[in-house]
Structure formats: C-alpha cells, structure tokens
Amino acid sequence: EGRGVCEGDRAAVGDAHSDADLARSIRRVGRAGFRQFSGDRVFGGAGQSRAGWKASLHRAVSLGVPHLTLHELDTGDAEKRADQLAFALTFLRAKGYVPYELTHFARPGHRSLHQEHVYAHGSILGLGPGAESFWAPDLPPSPAARRWSNVADLTAYVEGLQADAPPVAHDETLSTSALAREYMLLRLRTQAGLDLNALADRYDLRLRDRKADTLRRLRRRGLIHEDPDRVALTDRGRLLTDAITRRLLRELGPA
C-alpha cells in the first residue's frame, strides 16, 4: 500500500511520506508485475485544507492507483471531515471509482476481496503477533462464535508456539445478539447495505418489525434508500453513518 497526502498538508496529518515516495513505490509495483494494489489517503487533519485534500486525491488518481482507502483523523471537527468525505465521494465517482464501502473506493475489478469478506461478517484467521481472528460456525447461528487476538510481543508469541500453548491475549465468545449488532454495523457501511433477510436468517433479528417507525423517518429524511428487503444509506446518509448506526443499535437495547 502507498500512503500519503498533498505535499503541503503532510505535516497537518502527520504523514512522513512524500508524493515522490509514493510515485517511486507505484513504479516499482508496476515493474514487479502487480496489477492489484491499494493506496491510502488521509483526511481530517486540523491544518489540512480543502485544496490540499483535493490535490491529495487527484495525485492518487493521476498515479493510476486502482484501489483507495481513506483514513480519517478524528481531530474534533466533524463538519470538516464530513465535507471532505462528501467531496471524495463526488470526485472519485467521477474518476471511475466505486465507493463499495464508506472509506474504500475501487475501479471495476479492483475491490479488495479481504475487505468484502470482513464486511460480510466472514470468518477470519489471523496469524502472527497481534493478529486478530473471528470465527463463526456456519448457519444456523451458534453462541460458539469467537473473536480472539494473539499476544503482540514477538518473543512471547514464539515461546507460546514452542510450548504448544496458543499465544492468545484475548478471547471472547459472542452471543447471537452481539453478532447481530456487529453485522448491522458492518453492513451499514457498505454500498450494498444491510440485507434484512440475511439479518433475520443469520441472527434472528427482524429489524423492520422492531424499527419500522425509525426506518420510515430515516427514509423520509433522505438518509436511506427505499427497499423492503434492504437498508442502504444514501450519499447524505453516508455522511451520518455513525449517528444512524448508533441510533439503531441504541434502540435495540443492550447486546
């Protein structure tokens, strides 16, 4: 991955790489024969200008980066970050990028299969120090779904393997209710949205039955698309993803 911002905004977001560094890296990637790679753009820095953000995106596009991930810095100015994200949606779409997730943009044929698997709530096995794993049995849902993380220290990790003892730092079992909430949080970030039938089948949560009034209000405000089987955020709703998700999860009660 290549990460960067406009030269004039590097200090504003704490980025140590220059545009020249990024260009050299991309040339090396091309010479090595890679056609699938991703670049990162950082936004939300306290001193980052709108012009700088535009230049940062334009630079990545001009270098031919096929997949972009936007990283948000929470500096307290939510309005500024929303404005930058709104600009990115418009700008990158016009350049042929599809916003398949809130902060992941790809040209046709260049979506990250790993990211799509994550946002589909698929099982993941993480290997190495500090790696995180999520493992859920096949349908129907089971309380045996687990999430765990390995110890971050390399020495402790190796010693655990040598002693035939799993070097796990944290391990938790997830209830069906907790899984339903996670699935909602993940899917509401995606362009495809939250499949209400899948939510009911996988996690026994019938959201439309429980939150019909809330969904109706969100639809009237232009924050979600009208679809009897799916909740997908509009571009306006995407700028309020966290607030909409918190509202729906809060109204569901504790996990």
List each model region and its residues.
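Short amphipathic alpha-helical interaction segments
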Residues: 205-220
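Extended hydrophobic-aromatic, low-complexity segments
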Residues: 196-197, 209-210, 226
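A short, conserved structural fragment
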Residues: 219-229
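Structural preference for long, well-ordered alpha-helical segments in enzyme cores
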Residues: 181-184, 214, 244
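Short, amphipathic alpha-helical interaction segments positioned at domain boundaries
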Residues: 236-255
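C-terminal scaffold of the Radical SAM
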Residues: 1-205, 253-254
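Minor-groove-contacting beta-hairpin "wing" of winged helix-turn-helix DNA-binding domains
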Residues: 230-235
